Each structure stands twice: as structure tokens, then as C-alpha cells.
């Protein structure tokens, strides 16, 4: 089967190619697609090298599936052209998501909506995907009335330029103080910045132009993802509202989001508060989450060695096998290793290159009649983008549309 990956040289595009190979999608011919300046570059896949071609050339090759991650403008122009030659398009951009004629799909939740005539299918926003995978089964069982979510979104969501920028800031290549200096001396502020200013306060060097963010990201948090709207919300925040309604097929769910960019890699974190229409118990919530497809429960905040008994039992010891790799100093002693094996909650560093949505810190919300708080983490380049897109292609395959 011919499969095109549009945006093959970007962070998400490279992950799409990786996931296609990992999941053994039946690709007989890979068509890596990028801009004219990348034409001729080589992409490795299944032990072979494949040449990058232009979108126009790719359309003429008539692939069965084209997975897009090249931005809204490219999707707007080229998705219909691929669809016109009976190629199914799975688009990771925001362009088609809220189009009433297009399906917006998380396979674990609403794969049933895909019909044979759906030649353009939208991939949801990364932050929406991980939240809904975590809570969709809870909604089926207890009916969610309201969601309050704050996101902690890693820099890879902005692309390679953001990764390079954070590296440069941390390596003191652009005037940013090193962490040690910053902790000792503090960070000077630059108080003069017009509404259109896209400069960053960077230590004693003052303001320097930045390519990825309006302000320094290292040692900082930016409550600003995508453009601000007249309401004061950002487009990223409204994506979570609108996409939740469309995917869950329930416009009555109230969604109140705040999205924040954080200087980490590995995945996005989300603090999620849910209010339900029906009564819940923690035991029932844990049982539901354990059975939720795509979710790995990592919630052991009261290890055995603590004097307080953990009423929820031991969850997912698998993380215990991973923890000592990253905390080698603490795990040198038997006691340290035992502690790390038992204490568990989701963290971005462990989500990297994984496809699960990790859920933890589950607890009742005492301020409402029926509600919980939870924390979820997922690799935004994988389940938040590439893996979800490939899973949609797998649905097309399972339905024998391709």
C-alpha cells in the first residue's frame, strides 16, 4: 500500500513514519512529502531510504492514505487534492477539525463515526486527545457535567524551533543566565514591552529576538498557547472546548481550560477536575480507569513503607521498573530502590516515546457533590499526534476502506 506522510521532515512527521513502522502498518511504498526545499532528502523507513517529494508529485502517485502534519495552510490547499484522487487524508492540523462535514476522531472513543465517504478525517488537538482518552469512559458511566482543566504543555508541541531555542537558552548561547547563576542572582525583568513586542527578557543582555515564543521559555512558564481571542481565552483553549463537544457528541459538557507552555520535553501534563451528574466512589473510578482502553493507571502515592495505609491498593508496579533508571543516586541502596518502585504518578519524562495516556493523583473533590481530580500525562508527539493519526488509518484498514 502506498502511504504518504506530508510534513515528513518535521517532529510529528518523523514520529508518524516511526509509528507506521512500529505498528507494522502495511506500507509497500512510503511517499515522504515536504516543501520544495526539502525535495530529494532521504527518509529512512523499514531499512530503506525514500526520497522526499513535493505535494504535487505525491498526488500524482495516488497513495491510498496520506497523513498530514504540515500546518493548516498546507492542509487547506492539498488535502482536497489528495482526496480528489480517492486518497484518504488524516490531517493533524486544526484546519478541518470543526468543519461540520468532517469527522474528528479519537479511535478509542468514536471510531464508529468514520464512513467510507470520509476522505478527509481530522486528528484532534494533542491536549484534547489525552484528556478525552482519560475521561471518556468516566463520562459514559457517570455523565460529566463540567471539566476544569489546566495544561502543562511541553515545548515539542511548538516544533523543532522551540527545542532548539530551549537548548540555546540553557546553554547560555543567547544571553540567558545559566541555571546556577539565575538561582544565585535572580533574573532581571524588562518592563517595557508593547503589545506587538516579540522579544524575551534574557539576563543582563536585555531583550533579544526569539523565534518560538514571545518570552524566554527556560526557567519560565508561558500561559499563552496560540493566539489570544477577544474573550481573553486562547485558540488552544477553545480547541479543547469545541473538540470535546464534537468528539464526545455532547454539547452540554461545560469545559473551562487554561493552557500553559512549560520548559520540558517528553509530553504534556494536565490537571483535570471533573464534576459528575451521578455519584461516584474512588473504588469505582479506579476500576473504570483500569479498564479504559489506552490508559495506564499510575497512582501509588502512599507506598507500603508509609505508616498510612493506601486504601486503593498498589497500582501498576511497571513504573517501579522505570524509575531507578532516572534516579540512580536514590536507587543505590535497597531502601531507596524499594521506595522508588512503590511511589508512582505520571511524569512527562516517562511518557516519552510511549502511546499510553498515564493517569494518576486520582482523588475525590470535596467541594462538589460528585467530582474528582486527576492528573494525566501523554507524549504529545505520539498519542497526541502521530499515533492517533496512524490509529485512524488502521480504522480505515479494519473497515476495508483501503
Where in the sequence are the language-model features?
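A glycine-rich, Thr/Ser-enriched phosphate-binding loop motif common to dinucleotide/cofactor-binding enzymes
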Residues: 121-130, 232-241, 384-388
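Short amphipathic alpha-helices in soluble, non-transmembrane regions
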Residues: 283-292
Amino acid at each position: 500500500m502506498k502511504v504518504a506522510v506530508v510534513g515528513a521532515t518535521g517532529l510529528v512527521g518523523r514520529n508518524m513514519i516511526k509509528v507506521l513502522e512500529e505498528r507494522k502498518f502495511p506500507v509497500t511504498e512510503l511517499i515522504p512529502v515536504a516543501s520544495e526545499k526539502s525535495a530529494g532528502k532521504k527518509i529512512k523507513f523499514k531499512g530503506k531510504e525514500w526520497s522526499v517529494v513535493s505535494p504535487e508529485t505525491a498526488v500524482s502517485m495516488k497513495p491510498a492514505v496520506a497523513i498530514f502534519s504540515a500546518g493548516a495552510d498546507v492542509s487547506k490547499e492539498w488535502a482536497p487534492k489528495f482526496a480528489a484522487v480517492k486518497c484518504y487524508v488524516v490531517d493533524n492540523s486544526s484546519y478541518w477539525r470543526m468543519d461540520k462535514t468532517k469527522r474528528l476522531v479519537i479511535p478509542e472513543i468514536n471510531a464508529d463515526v468514520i464512513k467510507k465517504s470520509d476522505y478527509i478525517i481530522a486528528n484532534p488537538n494533542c491536549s484534547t486527545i489525552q484528556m478525552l482518552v482519560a475521561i471518556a469512559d468516566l463520562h459514559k458511566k457517570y455523565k460529566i457535567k463540567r471539566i476544569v482543566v489546566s495544561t502543562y504543555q511541553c515545548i515539542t508541541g511548538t516544533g523543532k524551533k522551540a527545542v532548539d531555542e530551549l537548548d540555546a537558552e540553557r546553554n547560555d548561547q543567547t544571553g540567558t543566565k545559566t541555571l546556577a547563576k539565575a538561582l544565585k542572582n535572580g533574573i532581571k525583568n524588562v518592563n517595557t514591552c508593547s503589545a506587538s513586542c516579540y522579544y524575551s527578557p534574557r539576563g543582563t543582555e536585555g531583550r533579544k529576538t526569539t523565534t518560538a515564543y514571545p518570552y524566554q521559555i527556560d526557567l519560565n512558564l508561558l500561559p499563552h498557547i496560540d493566539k489570544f481571542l477577544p474573550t481573553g481565552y486562547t485558540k488552544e483553549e477553545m480547541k479543547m472546548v469545541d473538540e470535546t463537544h464534537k468528539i464526545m457528541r455532547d454539547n452540554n459538557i461545560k469545559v473551562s481550560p487554561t493552557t500553559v507552555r512549560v520548559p520540558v520535553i517528553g509530553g504534556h501534563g494536565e490537571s483535570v477536575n471533573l464534576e459528575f451528574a451521578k455519584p461516584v466512589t474512588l473504588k469505582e473510578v479506579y476500576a473504570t480507569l483500569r479498564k479504559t482502553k489506552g490508559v495506564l493507571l499510575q497512582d501509588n502515592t502512599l507506598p507500603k513503607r508509609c505508616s498510612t495505609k493506601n486504601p486503593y491498593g498498589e497500582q501498576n508496579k511497571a513504573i517501579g521498573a522505570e524509575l531507578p533508571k532516572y534516579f540512580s543516586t536514590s536507587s543505590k541502596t535497597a531502601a531507596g530502590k524499594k521506595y522508588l518502585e512503590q511511589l508512582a504518578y505520571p511524569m512527562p519524562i516517562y511518557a516519552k516515546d510511549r502511546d499510553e495516556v498515564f493517569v494518576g493523583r486520582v482523588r475525590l473533590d470535596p467541594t462538589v457533590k460528585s467530582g474528582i481530580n486527576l492528573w494525566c500525562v501523554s507524549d504529545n508527539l505520539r498519542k497526541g499526534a502521530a499515533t492517533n493519526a496512524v490509529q485512524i488509518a488502521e480504522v480505515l484498514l479494519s473497515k476495508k476502506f483501503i
